[in-house]
């Protein structure tokens, strides 16, 4: 869903404050107004608009650093069609594979922002570089995601690591009020994964069918990139 802008601003501000208090080096640059997203974004992802919530988040003057749990970072607006390559494992989603923007990268997981339709504003997660068919919603909205991370810091399961200089996620399962799928950790319990997939409308893919689905998706990605380049 798309957050009320006041709710989103407050959720992001609270996360920034909590992350800084935990030890993360995050100078306060103040809030920036939302800038217009590049025209190419709509063309790359085949949508007719980009949500104000996403435009606002991308306009914030964050340092070029790993500010998110487990060393994740915010990805910039994409430059071209190669951004679609990130979506090669988005199999079984209840929305068109192309209508999502890669937003947060965690080395081994990718979080995307759904750009259109009834799932607009949701955050979905996919494994990176693995033959794993685990498409699932991480959070119903940006504000919900940042709120979970802030709660994780408060609960002591997201803490600053002196060696890496970023926030580390410890065991979040069983902690009251925390949703393990909101946190960039893997693997997750299959019972939780499958229950969330049913809840959010994802279609689980059997291991022996995953490669066939992925091959078709990769062909679609190549075709979309060719049209963008033409």
Name each model feature, range by range.
Residues 1-113, 183, 187-190, 194-230:
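A surface-exposed partner-binding patch
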Residues 60-178:
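Long, low-complexity, intrinsically disordered segments enriched in glycines and aromatic residues
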